[in-house]
């Protein structure tokens, strides 16, 4: 494994650990998810370019489309929760609470 792949894998790991540690606020969870998607995009693009996968050239673009949709939905959920409850705690998203 080259150093570049190792650094990208470490970026994914740090984002994942951040998602596990800072899951009380919705904004920090969304930022960690975006970091994970960015590292996946870079890893996928480099793998496709290095291995000359001509059939999979559109896969990073599709991943970016899904990441943009995820970010838009996450930000709209953040705005809705912060307007309703005044905070961005993830505990407010539990539908089973009264």
UniProtKB/Swiss-Prot annotation:
The chain crosses the membrane at residues 1-21, 29-49, 61-81. It is an enzyme of class 7 (translocase). Its EC number is 7.1.1.2. It comes from the Eukaryota. It is found in: Mitochondrion inner membrane. Pfam families: Oxidored_q2. GO terms for biological process: ATP synthesis coupled electron transport. GO terms for cellular component: mitochondrial inner membrane; respiratory chain complex I. It catalyses: a ubiquinone + NADH + 5 H(+)(in) = a ubiquinol + NAD(+) + 4 H(+)(out). The keyword Ubl conjugation does not apply. InterPro entries: NADH_UbQ_OxRdtase_chain4L/K, NUOK/Mnh_C1-like. Disulfide bonds: none annotated. It is a multi-pass membrane protein. Belongs to the complex I subunit 4L family. Core subunit of the mitochondrial membrane respiratory chain NADH dehydrogenase (Complex I) which catalyzes electron transfer from NADH through the respiratory chain, using ubiquinone as an electron acceptor. Part of the enzyme membrane arm which is embedded in the lipid bilayer and involved in proton translocation. This is NADH-ubiquinone oxidoreductase chain 4L. It comes from Phocarctos hookeri (Hooker's sea lion). The lineage of its organism: Eukaryota, Metazoa, Chordata, Craniata, Vertebrata.
